[in-house]
Regions:
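Helix-loop element at the rim of GNAT/NAT acetyltransferase active sites that forms part
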Residues: 17-33
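Conserved catalytic-core motifs of GNAT/GCN5-like acyltransferases
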Residues: 116-119, 136-153, 162-163, 168
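Conserved acetyl-CoA-binding loop-helix of GNAT-fold acetyltransferases
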Residues: 92-105, 128-132
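Glycine-rich phosphate/pyrophosphate-binding loop shared by adenosine-nucleotide-utilizing enzymes
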Residues: 2, 60-64, 152
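Conserved beta-strand-loop-alpha-helix junction that forms the acyl-donor binding cleft
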Residues: 91, 117-127
Length: 202
């Protein structure tokens, strides 16, 4: 059974365990694994305003995804940056795609108009995923990070998810969104995965 739900504080160590494997690759530009305390602080900071989701398979967390503000200044409030990390054993099974669909549907309720994703150029799997989801390349940051003895380019993907009204409604915090609407979106997307036997999907 697959379950997609909002994050809880008690998930922090399981999520950090997944993230730590990526810290040792160019996929994450963080060079040292953060402490449990620091990681929990990040979860709390992000999840108070934006969707932060986890995916469980038979009760075990196998991935997580969240949205966060794209930039700090007020005029950027209608954009959000998306991040997804999946346990390597579950890559390529549709979980990342399902996370994105759930996040985007929630972000629409929050009046987000554009979503972004920053992807290390060498991460070809993520490149293919974003293109298949209708993201386009907004630009490339050349040699923007140095890690593991190499300079790395970063691709900025973008996707429009709302109308650019002349006078847009302000961004709504996740706290302003009805909990049942979020639960329903998570359930709709987890049902898609439950109709596929991901344990036997290549």
């Amino acid at each position: 059974m697959i379950n997609i739900r909002r994050v809880k504080k008690s998930d922090a160590d399981a999520l950090l365990n997944i993230y730590s494997t990526y810290v040792h690759t160019p996929i994450s530009f963080e060079c040292d694994v953060p402490s449990s305390e620091e990681f929990l602080k990040r979860i709390c900071q992000i999840s108070k305003d934006y969707p932060y989701l986890v995916c469980e398979v038979e009760g075990n967390i196998v991935g997580y995804a969240y949205a966060n503000k794209f930039k700090e200044r007020e005029a950027y409030q209608w954009g959000a940056e998306l991040t997804v990390y999946i346990d390597e054993k579950y890559n390529g099974k549709g979980i990342g795609r399902t996370f994105y669909n759930a996040l985007i549907n929630i972000l629409k309720l929050q009046n987000i108009k554009t979503v972004y994703a920053l992807v290390t150029k060498s991460n070809t799997k993520s490149d293919r995923l974003h293109k298949s989801l209708g993201f386009s390349i907004a630009g490339i940051y050349h040699n923007t990070g140095y890690k593991l003895g190499e300079w790395h380019d970063v691709i900025c993907f973008e996707k429009t998810i709302g109308h650019y009204d002349a006078i847009p409604e302000k961004f709504k915090s996740i706290r302003e969104i009805n909990d049942q609407l979020i639960i329903d979106i998570c359930k709709q997307n987890q049902d898609i995965l439950n109709n596929i036997d991901i344990n036997h999907r290549n």
